[in-house]
A protein has these predicted regions:
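Short, glycine/charged-enriched secondary-structure capping and boundary segments
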Residues: 22, 48-51, 73, 115-119, ...
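Conserved D-loop beta-strand region of ABC ATPase nucleotide-binding domains
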Residues: 136
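Phosphate-binding/switch loop-helix module in NTP-utilizing enzymes
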Residues: 70-132
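Conserved P-loop
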Residues: 4-92
Length: 173
């Protein structure tokens, strides 16, 4: 089966949720899943379910750098090193019998210069033919849009955060 590229993007809720849902579906079909998270600390509730599945590996950065807007130059440099190392590690792992490779928030990591988009594009072009790939995040470049076979935009029309309601465990994270 030819692997395709999915891109879930936009300012609306549901990008990671869609990627998790596809991961569970693939795992349920006996597929091997590698779920990598960028810009998050690995504590989101959905990762508990993924980690419990036998044929799913979750990869996150061990260090929490906080929100990009709050990072100083030194923290951005450290984050760039850590996320670039994570990307290299998971790209290598994804070529070893993985069926579905999720790069959650990789689009945002590219936008912030924390991983090199050119590295990601080169990987997408040279990946194993059967490898299905999911990318999530806001504001993808035209290069990422062009590389994707599925492009789904999640657009916010209304969100409780706009009324001051904070993210809730088990719903938003």
């Amino acid at each position: 089966m030819q692997g395709l590229i999915h891109l879930y993007f936009g300012d609306g809720k549901g990008k990671t949720t869609a990627a998790v849902g596809l991961s569970i579906r693939a795992a349920g079909a006996g597929k091997r899943v590698l779920f990598a998270q960028f810009l998050k600390d690995g504590s989101s509730s959905e990762l508990n379910v993924l980690r419990a599945l036998q044929n799913v590996e979750v990869a996150c950065c061990e260090q929490n750098f906080g929100f990009f807007k709050a990072m100083d130059g030194q923290t951005k440099a450290a984050a760039r090193l850590a996320y670039s190392a994570l990307l290299e590690d998971v790209m290598r792992k994804s070529t070893d019998g993985v069926d579905l490779f999720v790069l959650d928030e990789a689009v945002a990591a590219c936008n912030h210069g924390l991983i090199e988009e050119a590295t990601l594009i080169d990987f997408l072009r040279g990946r194993p033919k059967a490898l299905e790939v999911v990318l999530t995040g806001r504001d993808p470049s035209q290069h990422l849009l062009d590389a994707a076979d599925y492009v789904t935009e999640m657009r916010k029309r209304k969100h409780p955060f706009d009324r001051g309601i904070a993210a809730r465990r088990g719903v938003e994270f």
